[in-house]
Amino acid sequence: MFIDGKWILREDIDVFDPYTLENIEKITALDREETKSAIEVAEKNKEIMKNLSPSKRYSILMKIAEQISLKKDLFAKTISIDVGKPIKQSKIEVDRTLTALKLSAFYAKELRGETINSENGLIFTKKEPLGVVGAITPFNFPLNLITHKIGPAIATGNSVVLHPSSKAPIVAIYLTKIIEHVLKQMDVPRGIFNLATGNGDIVGDEISKNDNINMVSFTGSVEVGESISKNAKMKKVALELGGNNPMIVLKDSDIKLAAKSAVKSKFLNAGQVCISVGQVLVEEEVLETFTKHVIEETKKLILGNPLDTKTDIGPLISPESALRIENLIKKSVNEGGEVLIGGNRQNSLISPAVINIDENNILSKIETFGPVLPILKVKDSEEAVSIANNSKYGLQAGVFTNDINKAMKIADSLEYGGIMINSSPTFRKDNMPFGGVKKSGLGREGIKYTVEEMCETKTIVIHNI
């Protein structure tokens, strides 16, 4: 809806507040031809973007960060209304966004090649942009996950087509207005950045298939990620997909700390986090104590209006998502699961649930993406690792133990992209490599690592004459 510096404004899609269920906005849904047009504009402007100096790319990113910083409260409130995220969590997301942009700006000046020794002359490499990056982002972190893609894209001199989730597009629109202002202020053609709102099966599909896109960076479901991978053919693809992230709690660990970490991490953003705790695997000797502490911590959580600063858990993104979680809980119970607390639904709200299950239960196999914390009893660390690895996912895992040798042995055995020792799988810093194995994705995010993904290495050889 923002193509070549012009806004296309229609009322095609209704956007709802997930808490009040009120219609808060109507946005444009681009058709396939309009999406192609956005991509063509980005392609035509890629040489302009490539030729911007590193210092200018740096300045663009720093000015975007500066403008967001001036409107931190507006962005935080918009995230909470757009997604249903508690306002205190939305404020953290805005702060992380500023970090991502500033890191991207730093790496804009740090792009460098290498010199290779040769007896016949000089060999050196340089980093060049790919061309056009298609960024497809989810609803759950509608600002931070955008900047994790467009920040490195701008830093490396790529033009951008951004396709945000149609469930939570308002933050992306506000961000685009800031980018428009900054590009105008710096006398840079607005066509280097294009916003393509609409339905994923049209806009996202065209981005993944279009030959003028040089890289697709996608965060979302496994099913859509697999479709993008097939459609992309020879273009570069970065996929950050789902996970059922295990947290292993051994008997020698700080049980109270582990319980607090599990509850805080599981119910962040109502469980709608790709690295949310998927299941807790607890050694049987400490299961009762751990479960007691988890229930105590869960009872402290306040469910309700995301704009209330006291709220810990807001709604899921839609009543349909909440109904899906309610049905998953019922299925889990039918398979032998025992609900210890919570699990009650009202519209888009689900009270935080803790459920005892075994390894054959559905909650041990899938990505829940909701406020449900499954607990499994295991006899030892070997059984915990075996259950954790018996998964199609491999994003992140957590291990709680006071024995560093045991922790390192488990970390080596777990088939996951990231292992957090004495922390939950939900831990992430914006400058660390982030990504999974198996069906949890391809490539790594984290600003430095995304910058590397969004470059080509060109080799130049100067022969002696």
Curated annotation (Swiss-Prot):
It is an enzyme of class 1 (oxidoreductase). One of its GO terms (molecular function) is lactaldehyde dehydrogenase (NAD+) activity. CDD domains: ALDH_LactADH_F420-Bios (cd07145). Keywords: NAD, Oxidoreductase. It comes from the Archaea. Its EC number is 1.2.1.22. NAD(+) binds at residues 220-225. The active site is at 240, 274. It catalyses: (S)-lactaldehyde + NAD(+) + H2O = (S)-lactate + NADH + 2 H(+). Pathway: Cofactor biosynthesis; coenzyme F420 biosynthesis. Involved in F420 biosynthesis through the oxidation of lactaldehyde to lactate. Homotetramer. Belongs to the aldehyde dehydrogenase family. This is Lactaldehyde dehydrogenase.
